[in-house]
């Protein structure tokens, strides 16, 4: 009895073990399960088809599987039977590891189901559905896995399941059934409801949407509040500005023009009126300068300054007017843009600002040299006249040492503006009809006539209109009559090119660099009572002496008409003169009322650096003449932009006005001083009188070859003079035909080639070989 009673107490029941030992055994089981799971995943992930396995034989010594040969063999079996779906076994192990971890970490055991057998059966059934559906889908759909598995995708079982379903239900039907099995298997294996999952996802999406909507509404509310706050601040700031007093605008009045001593000297009555110490015309020939009048009052300047600030502020541009410079025609307001305001904004508002200020135009000056502000040029209500007499009587004009000083007018501050044509050295003038271009050219010509005598400056005037420059006909400064025929204009330019080449040859021979150096050598020789002979004389035995050479100014009133009639040849001649003629003392003044690219070509623009733009019709014309806009905003009636050479900023100048009566009085005064000394043949093309010869100059081209002298229209008259007087003398032909020395010498040389006269003897005389009226040959000296 005693032995029977003690037997049950000696058995080892796990449930009766202490809790610590039970927990220790549970941890050992969990670690073993974790190790098995890791080893399982390792041999599957490191599977290599080349390793030896159950499904194939291999003699490879180096096994790449991390589980060695056993692991390679076991992985080959799993993948051969299940395919890639063998990884679902790893999921099963991981689920058990996760459940064991929960049991270890909890103080109490995880509650089990009331019917553990039913729960385990449902789990295994769900796993079987997942595994079967996965193998079937793999066999039907995932054909690309064939290269990585020992057999076909899905393994042996997948091939059986997928092939049977595809044969029975077709490709699509089998796929749908397998997807249904996979979905049900997931629900049974993980013990979750798809409906609950859908509800949770929907609740999460709804929460995100409501949160986003709430944040957007809050952001809109904050933006509305900020806008209301800014609006309140702007209203307060606007009311504060209205009561602020703006600083007064600095008004700079134009300085008085300083008159030269010449004006005061001419006002004095000379003791002997018949004695003249100068051939220059008197300033009294011009109209008197009217008294200066105030164009804009200080109150108007202050009011306009505030109006400019207000109008620009209406357009969203904050500026401050810091200074005003009233002039004879326009007033420049210097404005300082606020921080962040671009200059292009103000430039684009020029037309709108002019309309709001009820003005014809407003010119915006983006850059003022030496200042950090911009300029607005507004026309004055009352325009003050700028007379040429005021500019010619100024100290600036009379103190200029250059004999090619031209009076342009006054700048915006009322100061006289003069320019030296010798430094330009050529000038391009453009402007529409009525812009004051012709008056400006007359002012330039009169400036030259008031500065230099006829022996220092000579003119060639080309006037296609036959109205503008014909008034100067007969003055001593002209080299030829005023040219009105455009073909003769081409001959005149051709002569100028030949004269330029001749002067360069002379300067090169004498070792000087420009015309001033040449004339200085002539003066020094004259002071020593010596003469410098022409090194290129046609009579080398008796060369003629050289004289001082005058500067030549060629004025073309309408370049467009000249280009249209004569064509491309004129462009080449103008380009040659513009490129080389500066040192030779030849200068161009080109004017046109059509500043288009076919008139002012790139070749001409490249060699004429000085530009004067009167009012033009468009921005394109302004860019053509100035390479920038601005001339389209001028006021006309002599308002111009003067672009000096070497600068990119044009200066606004109000041109000096000179009437036709003033021009007539000056011209009559000059005519009374002497007859013009025209150069014969200058307009005849190829027969112009000169030295050195050349193509189209001095008849060099027409006289090349024996007997070619008959091309000279005076050749027959020269032969008659020689035969009639029975004497072959250069001075005789020169005196009777009133031509130059060189031309007469060439005519005698042509007679020598034709056999009319003999060659020059040792004493410089020629014999006449032509028969007399009786038919006998007479030889006379």
Swiss-Prot record:
Signal sequence segment: none
Gene name per UniProt: ftsK2
Domain commentary: Consists of an N-terminal domain, which is sufficient for the localization to the septal ring and is required for cell division, followed by a linker domain, and a C-terminal domain, which forms the translocation motor involved in chromosome segregation. The C-terminal domain can be further subdivided into alpha, beta and gamma subdomains. The alpha and beta subdomains multimerise to produce a hexameric ring, contain the nucleotide binding motif and form the DNA pump.
Organismal lineage: Bacteria, Pseudomonadati, Pseudomonadota, Betaproteobacteria, Burkholderiales
Record's bilayer topology term: Multi-pass membrane protein
Protein name as annotated: DNA translocase FtsK 2
Functional note: Essential cell division protein that coordinates cell division and chromosome segregation. The N-terminus is involved in assembly of the cell-division machinery. The C-terminus functions as a DNA motor that moves dsDNA in an ATP-dependent manner towards the dif recombination site, which is located within the replication terminus region. Translocation stops specifically at Xer-dif sites, where FtsK interacts with the Xer recombinase, allowing activation of chromosome unlinking by recombination. FtsK orienting polar sequences (KOPS) guide the direction of DNA translocation.
Keywords: ATP-binding, Cell cycle, Cell division, Cell inner membrane, Cell membrane, Chromosome partition, DNA-binding, Membrane, Nucleotide-binding, Transmembrane, Transmembrane helix
Organism (species): Ralstonia nicotianae (strain ATCC BAA-1114 / GMI1000)
PROSITE patterns: FTSK (PS50901)
């Amino acid at each position: 009895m005693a032995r029977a009673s003690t037997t049950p107490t000696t058995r080892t029941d796990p449930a009766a073990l202490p809790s610590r030992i039970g927990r220790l055994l549970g941890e050992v089981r969990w670690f073993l399960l974790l190790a098995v799971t890791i080893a399982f995943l390792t041999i599957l992930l490191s599977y290599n088809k080349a390793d030896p396995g159950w499904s194939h034989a291999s003699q490879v010594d180096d096994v790449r599987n991390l589980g060695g040969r056993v692991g390679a063999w076991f992985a080959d079996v799993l993948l051969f039977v299940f395919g890639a779906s063998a990884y679902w076994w790893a999921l099963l192990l991981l689920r058990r590891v996760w459940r064991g971890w929960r049991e270890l970490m909890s103080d109490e055991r995880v509650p089990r189901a009331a019917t553990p057998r039913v729960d385990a059966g449902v789990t295994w059934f769900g796993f079987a559905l997942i595994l079967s559906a996965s193998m079937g889908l793999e066999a039907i759909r995932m054909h690309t896995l064939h290269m990585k598995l020992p057999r076909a995708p899905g393994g042996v079982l997948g091939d059986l399941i997928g092939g049977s379903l595809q044969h029975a239900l077709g490709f699509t039907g089998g796929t749908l059934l397998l997807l249904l099995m996979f979905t049900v298997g997931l629900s049974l294996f993980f013990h979750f409801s798809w409906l609950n999952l859908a509800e949770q996802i929907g609740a999460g999406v709804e929460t995100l949407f409501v949160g986003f909507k709430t944040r957007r509404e809050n952001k809109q509310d904050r933006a509305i509040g900020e806008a209301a706050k800014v609006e309140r601040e702007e209203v307060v700031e606007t009311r504060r500005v209205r009561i602020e007093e703006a600083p007064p605008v600095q008004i700079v009045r134009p300085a008085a023009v300083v008159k030269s001593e010449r004006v005061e000297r001419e006002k004095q009555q000379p003791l002997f009126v018949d004695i003249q110490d100068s051939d220059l015309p008197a300033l009294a020939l011009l109209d008197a300068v009217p008294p200066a009048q105030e164009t804009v009052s200080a109150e108007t300047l202050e009011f306009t300054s505030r109006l400019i600030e207000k109008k620009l502020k209406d357009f969203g541009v904050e500026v401050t007017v810091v200074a005003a410079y009233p002039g004879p025609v326009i007033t420049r307001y210097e404005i300082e843009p606020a921080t962040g305001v671009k200059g292009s904004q103000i430039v684009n508002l020029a037309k709108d600002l002019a309309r709001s200020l009820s003005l014809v135009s407003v010119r915006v000056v983006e850059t003022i040299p030496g200042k950090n502000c911009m300029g607005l040029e507004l026309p004055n209500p009352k325009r003050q006249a700028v007379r040429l007499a005021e500019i010619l009587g100024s100290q600036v004009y009379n103190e200029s040492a250059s004999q090619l000083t031209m009076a342009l007018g006054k700048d915006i501050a009322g100061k006289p503006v003069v320019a030296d044509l010798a430094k330009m050295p050529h000038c391009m003038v453009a402007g529409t009809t009525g812009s004051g271009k012709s008056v400006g050219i007359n002012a330039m010509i009169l400036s030259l006539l008031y500065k230099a005598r006829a022996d220092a400056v000579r003119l060639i005037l080309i006037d296609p209109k036959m109205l503008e420059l014909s008034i100067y006909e007969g003055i001593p400064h002209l080299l030829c009559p005023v040219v009105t025929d455009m073909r003769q204009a081409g001959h005149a330019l051709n002569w100028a090119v030949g004269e330029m080449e001749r002067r360069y040859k002379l300067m090169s021979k004498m070792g000087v660099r420009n015309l001033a150096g040449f004339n200085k050598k002539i003066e020094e020789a004259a002071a020593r009572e010596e003469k410098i002979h022409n090194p290129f004389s046609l009579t080398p035995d008796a060369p003629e002496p050289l004289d001082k050479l005058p500067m030549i100014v060629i004025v073309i009133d309408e370049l467009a008409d000249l280009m249209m009639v004569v064509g491309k040849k004129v462009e080449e001649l103008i380009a040659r003169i513009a490129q080389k003629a500066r040192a030779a003392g030849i200068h161009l003044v080109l004017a046109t009322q059509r500043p288009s690219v076919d008139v002012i070509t790139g070749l001409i623009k490249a060699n004429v650096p000085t530009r004067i733009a009167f009012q033009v019709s468009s921005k394109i014309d302004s860019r053509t003449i100035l390479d920038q806009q601005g001339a389209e905003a001028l006021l006309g009636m002599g308002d111009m932009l003067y672009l000096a050479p070497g600068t990119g900023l044009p200066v606004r100048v109000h041109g000096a006005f000179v009437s036709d009566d003033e021009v007539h009085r000056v011209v009559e005064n000059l005519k009374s001083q002497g007859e013009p000394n025209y150069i014969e043949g200058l307009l005849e093309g190829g027969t112009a009188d000169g030295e050195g010869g050349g193509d189209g100059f001095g008849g060099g081209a027409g006289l090349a070859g024996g007997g070619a002298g008959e091309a000279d229209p005076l050749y027959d008259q020269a032969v008659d003079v020689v035969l009639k007087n029975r004497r072959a003398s250069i001075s005789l032909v020169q005196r009777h035909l009133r031509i130059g020395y060189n031309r007469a010498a060439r005519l005698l040389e042509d007679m020598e080639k034709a056999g009319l006269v003999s060659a020059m003897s040792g004493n410089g005389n020629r014999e006449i070989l032509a028969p007399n009226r009786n038919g006998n040959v007479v030889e006379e000296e």
